[in-house]
């Protein structure tokens, strides 16, 4: 009789954790994360609560101080004269500090506003007779003249030069005698010219007026004015065709500009 023997198959080794262990680890992880979040929230709450309590304590101390100060002024309570004097001194120092801080803030704000504002730039000059009878009119700082800032200057008595760029209102008024010979038909022309810091001169405004045939001096005025953007170092001047006809009395002929 032949007996057969079969060797039992080896037991399979478990490669993963049991299901109960996985559930335990998952719950432990959730618990730790929840505890960390709760700790952070509690710390934030505690910090804010402590700040609020500290503020309330300070307010309470201020209230007690003011209440004691009132008692000192009324002569009530058991506070000694020395304590009252000390409290009054502290209160006066506090008021003085608050007043000084307000004044410093006002001064700083005023200085900042002054620094932000553009300085006023304005000029107004009157005509002056020129023996050379040149076509470019001469001007002078006399009579009712204005030279508001050192950022504008009258150069060579002929042109106004600005040292800061910006928009300017430039104007001129020229009064002249309109009597001419009947045979001459040439009008009296006034031109407002720009001389940039670099480049050639160019005309900004021009106006013309006809002459009369009268032998008497019939006064006529030409007014020019406009807004122009001038660069730093630019100059403006006035040119006429007959400088000998210009009237130079006060108030008749003038020239100026104003920064907008």
UniProtKB/Swiss-Prot annotation:
Q: List the disulfide bonds.
A: 177-217
Q: Which InterPro entries match?
A: CD40L, TNF_CS, TNF_dom, Tumour_necrosis_fac-like_dom
Q: Name one GO molecular function term.
A: tumor necrosis factor receptor binding
Q: How is it modified after translation?
A: The soluble form derives from the membrane form by proteolytic processing.
In the UniProt record, which residues carry a glycan? Answer: 239
- Chief subcellular location equals membrane
Location comes to: Cell membrane; Cell surface
Q: Could you tell me which residue ranges are on the Cytoplasmic side of the membrane?
A: 1-22
Marked site (Cleavage) residue numbers: 111-112
Record membrane topology: Single-pass type II membrane protein
The tissues where this chain's protein is expressed are given as: Specifically expressed on activated CD4+ T-lymphocytes.
For the THD domain, which residue ranges apply?
Answer: 121-260
Give me the Gene Ontology terms describing cellular component: external side of plasma membrane; extracellular space; Golgi apparatus
TM ranges: 23-46
Residue ranges in the Extracellular topological domain are 47-260
Q: Which Gene3D superfamilies match?
A: 2.60.120.40
Keywords, A to Z? Cell membrane, Cytokine, Disulfide bond, Glycoprotein, Membrane, Secreted, Signal-anchor, Transmembrane, Transmembrane helix
Gene Ontology terms: biological process: B cell differentiation; B cell proliferation; CD40 signaling pathway; inflammatory response; integrin-mediated signaling pathway; isotype switching; negative regulation of apoptotic process; platelet activation
**Keyword flag Ion transport:** no
Among Pfam families, the record links this protein to: TNF
**Record's subunit section:** Homotrimer. Interacts with CD28. CD40 ligand, soluble form: Exists as either a monomer or a homotrimer. Forms a ternary complex between CD40 and integrins for CD40-CD40LG signaling.
Q: What does this protein do?
A: Cytokine that acts as a ligand to CD40/TNFRSF5. Costimulates T-cell proliferation and cytokine production. Its cross-linking on T-cells generates a costimulatory signal which enhances the production of IL4 and IL10 in conjunction with the TCR/CD3 ligation and CD28 costimulation. Induces the activation of NF-kappa-B. Induces the activation of kinases MAPK8 and PAK2 in T-cells. Mediates B-cell proliferation in the absence of co-stimulus as well as IgE production in the presence of IL4. Involved in immunoglobulin class switching.
> Which family, according to the similarity comment?
Belongs to the tumor necrosis factor family.
Protein name from the UniProt record: CD40 ligand
Per the UniProt entry, what species is this protein from, by scientific name?
Answer: Mus musculus
